[in-house]
Swiss-Prot record:
Keywords: Cytoplasm, Decarboxylase, Lyase, Porphyrin biosynthesis. GO terms for biological process: protoporphyrinogen IX biosynthetic process from glutamate. One of its GO terms (molecular function) is uroporphyrinogen decarboxylase activity. This is Uroporphyrinogen decarboxylase.
Length: 343
C-alpha cells in the first residue's frame, strides 16, 4: 500500500506502524539549500509567491529525508495580504503589519483575493505533479484567531494582549473580523484542494492564551465554520486542526470543530494523547528542543511517543515547528528511529 494511502488511512482512524512522518516547518532555515534559495528570492513574500522557488523549497526536505508528507511552502499571513493588508517580513523581527482599525475591519473585503493567491494555487498544482505518488500533499491556512492577533497588534506579542483587549472592547468588530477571515480561509483551502492538496491543516498557534469563553468564541467557532464550509464542498478531504497550547481543551476543540485529525503540542501528556486517539488520529508531539539536543534526549522522546501512541492512529511529528539551529544529523537520526521501529 502506498504511504500516501497509509497517511490518509491514519486520518480515517486506522493504526499503522511505523507511523507516517513529517515535520512542521520542514522546509526551513535549518537546511542550507533553503537558505540559498531564500537568498535568491529576495523577500520572504517573494519566495511564497514565486511558484518556481516555492516548489523548490517545498521539495527540498522530501528529497533529503523522504518524508511521508509534503506541506506547501507559504505563510499564514498571505490571507490578510491577499485581502489588501500591508504585510512584510523583516530579518530578526518576523512579520510586521499595519494594525487594522475598527473602520477598516468593517470594510475588509477584496474582489481580487483569489487573483492575489493564484501563485500559491499554481505552486500546489506543480507540487502535486512533481511529488512522488506516495507522498501526501498538505495545504494549510492560519486559524482566524491567530491571524487576527497579528492584524490587530501589527506583530507577534508574547501573550497576544493587544488582540485580547481589542476583542473585549470591540466585540462586534472582532467577531466580524473572525467571520471575514473564516470565510476567506475556507475559500483558500477549497482552492488548494482543487489544485491538488490531499489534506489541509489549520494552524492556531495562539489558542493557548485564551480563557474558556474566549477559546470557544475565538478559536472553536471560526475553525468549525471553516470545517463546515470546506466539507460542504470536499467532504472526503481530511482536515487537521492544531490549536497549540489548548491543554485540557483539545477534546472540546475536536468535538466542536469537527476536524479529522488533531495536532498536539509537546506539553500534552502522552496518557492524555492516548485518550485523544480514541476519537481519531493525533499528530505530534515531539518537543522540538529534543530534536535540537539529539542523543539520548531525542531517542527517549521518540521511543516514548511510539510506545504510547504507536498502536493507535498516529502521524509522527514535532509538537511545533523545527527550529533553525537543529542539526540535520539529528533529523536523520529521528527519521531512522521512527522508520526502523518495531513493536
Amino acid at each position: 500500500m502506498p504511504k500516501s494511502r497509509i497517511m490518509l488511512d491514519v486520518l480515517k482512524g486506522e493504526a499503522h506502524f511505523p507511523p507516517p512522518l513529517w515535520m512542521m516547518r520542514q522546509a526551513g532555515r535549518y537546511l542550507p539549500e533553503y537558505r540559498e534559495t531564500r537568498r535568491r528570492a529576495g523577500s520572504f513574500l517573494d519566495l511564497c509567491y514565486d511558484p518556481d522557488l516555492a516548489v523548490e523549497v517545498t521539495l527540498q526536505p522530501i528529497e533529503r529525508f523522504g518524508f511521508d508528507a509534503s506541506i506547501l511552502f507559504s505563510d499564514i499571513l498571505v490571507v490578510p495580504h491577499a485581502l489588501g493588508r500591508d504585510v512584510r517580513f523583516e530579518e530578526g523581527r518576523g512579520p510586521l503589519l499595519t494594525p487594522i482599525s475598527v473602520a477598516e475591519i468593517m470594510a475588509l473585503e477584496s474582489d481580487v483575493f483569489h487573483v492575489n493567491l493564484e501563485p500559491v494555487y499554481e505552486t500546489v498544482r506543480r507540487l502535486r505533479a512533481k511529488l512522488p505518488d506516495e507522498t501526501t500533499l498538505i495545504g494549510f491556512c492560519g486559524a482566524p484567531w491567530t491571524v487576527a492577533t497579528y492584524m490587530i497588534a501589527g506583530h507577534g506579542t508574547p501573550d497576544q494582549a493587544p488582540a485580547r483587549l481589542f476583542a473585549y472592547r470591540e466585540p462586534a468588530a472582532f467577531q466580524h473580523l473572525l467571520k471575514v477571515l473564516a470565510d476567506h480561509s475556507a475559500a483558500y483551502l477549497i482552492r488548494q484542494i482543487e489544485a491538488g492538496a490531499d489534506v489541509v491543516q489549520i494552524f492556531d498557534s495562539w489558542s493557548g492564551v485564551l480563557d474558556d469563553a474566549s477559546f470557544d468564541q475565538f478559536c472553536v467557532w471560526p475553525v468549525a465554520e471553516i470545517v463546515r464550509q470546506v466539507q460542504a464542498v470536499h467532504p472526503d478531504v481530511p482536515i487537521i486542526g492544531f490549536p497549540k497550547g489548548a491543554g485540557a481543551r483539545y477534546r472540546t476543540y475536536r468535538q466542536k470543530t469537527g476536524v479529522t485529525g488533531l495536532g498536539i503540542d509537546w506539553t500534552v501528556p502522552l496518557a492524555a494523547a492516548k485518550d485523544l486517539q480514541r476519537s481519531g488520529a493525533v499528530q505530534g508531539n515531539l518537543d522540538p528542543l529534543r530534536l535540537v539536543a539529539g542523543g539520548k534526549a531525542l531517542s527517549d522522546g521518540v521511543e516514548a511517543i511510539l510506545k504510547a501512541l504507536g498502536d493507535g492512529p498516529l502521524i509522527f511529528n514535532l509538537g511545533h515547528g523545527i527550529t533553525p539551529e537543529t542539526p540535520i544529523a539529528h533529523v536523520e537520526a529521528m527519521v531512522k528511529q521512527v522508520r526502523s521501529a518495531a513493536r
